[in-house]
Amino acid sequence: MATFSQKPAEVVKKWVLIDAEGLVVGRLASLVANRLRGKHKATFTPHVDDGDNVIIINADKVVLTGKKYTDKKYYWHTGHPGGIKERTARQILEGRFPERVLEKAIERMIPRGPLGRRQMKNLRVYAGPNHQHEAQQPEVLDVAALNRKNKGNA
């Protein structure tokens, strides 16, 4: 019996909707990264985009445990000498694009490369409760019910 290898033409993708309100960032990001990669399926193949399409709503209401809300720093470089910049998680969550905290957490849990970039395109993150994917009839996934630690104390 040969080892099973999924072909790209045989992939069946589902749409999954997750409400991130009150959920812990890292635990949610880990679960979503596995869904995007397709590791929750028995047909997982490392070199094939086998994951689901994931929609996350209320990304602005996620919870960071400990002192990460005030102390965690996100760094980037402008490309100019001395151009290192930083923002705290609090500044980002209270800023214009609060969904970026969750996007970055998920992005950093997915392997870098062409396949990882393609898998990240299957992720849609929205700060508010509205999304434009009703036509896809997404299946609701209750992450808070999977483990009591998934829900933050905020």
Swiss-Prot record:
CDD domains membership: Ribosomal_L13
Family statement drawn from the similarity comment of this UniProt entry: Belongs to the universal ribosomal protein uL13 family.
Protein origin, superkingdom: Bacteria
Keyword list, A-Z: Ribonucleoprotein, Ribosomal protein
GO BP term, example: negative regulation of translation
Source organism of this protein record: Brucella ovis (strain ATCC 25840 / 63/290 / NCTC 10512)
Subunit relationships: Part of the 50S ribosomal subunit.
Lineage: Bacteria, Pseudomonadati, Pseudomonadota, Alphaproteobacteria, Hyphomicrobiales
Molecular-function GO terms, alphabetical: mRNA binding; structural constituent of ribosome
InterPro entries attached to this UniProt entry: Ribosomal_uL13, Ribosomal_uL13_bac-type, Ribosomal_uL13_sf
Transport among keywords: no
A Pfam family hit: Ribosomal_L13
HAMAP family named in the record: Ribosomal_uL13 (MF_01366)
Function: This protein is one of the early assembly proteins of the 50S ribosomal subunit, although it is not seen to bind rRNA by itself. It is important during the early stages of 50S assembly.
PANTHER family associated with the record: LARGE RIBOSOMAL SUBUNIT PROTEIN UL13M, RIBOSOMAL PROTEIN L13
GO cellular component: cytosolic large ribosomal subunit
This protein's name: Large ribosomal subunit protein uL13
